[in-house]
Amino acid sequence: MEISQGAEESLEIMGDPNVISSITATVTDRTLVISSKEDLPANSSLSYKLTVKNLTGVLLNEFGVIKIPTCTTDSLELTVNGPGRMDLGEIKVTDLKFVVNGNGSIEADSVTSTKLTVTSIDTGAVTIRGGSTVDLILELGPGFFLGADFKSTNVTLNMNGSGSAQVWSVEKLDATVNGAGKVIYFGEPTMSMSISGGGQLSGGGNK
């Protein structure tokens, strides 16, 4: 599925007509729900193009890939449950939330925000290749956060388990690591840390 913003809202479904006939799309309380009346064949291939005026949240359950090339809005929450993946392009959101439950992933080329909250308490992964935020808040388990080139003014990190994180903090880093997790930070922030259970916190140099 590819999601874009536009003046007119629309949903286009492409694929085998016999498979499309089992797909339902309903709107309840301003939430679009796309589901299937029955189990789809393993070899079925469907693609979706969704255009919305204002995007405030996306929930991906189980398998699948959702692409959002660009998005500009005040508040947005993106959630992946299971092994699915979200591929993001240039995202400009004041208050942004990423939630990964399971072994899914969220990957972004660029994020610009005032506040970004990332929650990934399972084995999922979040990757941000560029952009900046004022406040980055991370709640991590055994998964991964890769943001060495994502500039954050302040970083608050709470890691429980054997996860791995790379962060770039300019002013302040508040890190708590419980377990065998590993954190690499870039920049020269003022630091407050609590490490137990064999965890590691090390500097990767200034940027």
PLM regions and their residue ranges:
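Residues at the loop-to-beta-strand transition
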Residues: 56, 64, 84, 104, ...
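Acidic (Asp/Glu) and glycine-rich low-complexity loops/linkers
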Residues: 1-81, 88-99, 110-117, 129-137, ...
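Glycine/small-residue-rich hydrophobic helix-like segments
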Residues: 132, 137-170
